[in-house]
């Protein structure tokens, strides 16, 4: 399969050159939708790293690892688990023939514990590193230490869409090569929709639940002939289920499929949401569709502006999920999903 249609192809020559030096360290900055997750690992395989060992691509989410492996295997025309595979908790599609493996940061951390020298691994690629995690940060430090010690043949690549790279470049050392690729982005019109206010029956007014607000905007969007597939961002599984249930019962949704998309969903259902069919779709997703995955056919994005994020709760003495507003950078990333195929 030829990946020449991906914007990331513009840095192929630079990447090949950077991989030829001893103990290569590469920091790659490329926007969401540039094809770095699906394009860079095959380029590294073309450079001969797959002949020397496994190219490990670290993802922050299980769903991303699973779907990316399936997508790359399909693009290369190979069976999943043979040349291209993945390993996440409770699932392992890797064989002795595997050259590219998509794994979670937790899985890499486990491998580093079981095989401290990462025998049989030729390269480690940290994808979506801007989605920082303790496990990912620790694993990067251990891999860099390993490269400075017994594994000087190991290639280390860190890829990010939005991260400020100056500090990371300094941490990775003076030998780190910085590459930057451009994305392919059509103009996107951003419209803020203030929620309608409804009475609570006691003389007070308040916005309706966010799934009702989202349904109002989706109804307006699908009236347009050129709205394409619609991607709705919700903060969590509960809100996604309520939104899907509400949309599925609307008569104006006739002729459109509606799919949920989140990490704990069954793999078969995730595939249905991501793979494009003949019927227009409305996909209701968590922030996994913000950077980790590119869903083809999306021309309209409905953003709740919220996310559930893990954080320390001093009253409970444990990590819990907090409902918070997204950052300006995240809002731009979500809006940009509407500009991948057309204005």
Descriptions of predicted regions:
Residues 1-343:
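P-loop NTPase motor module signature
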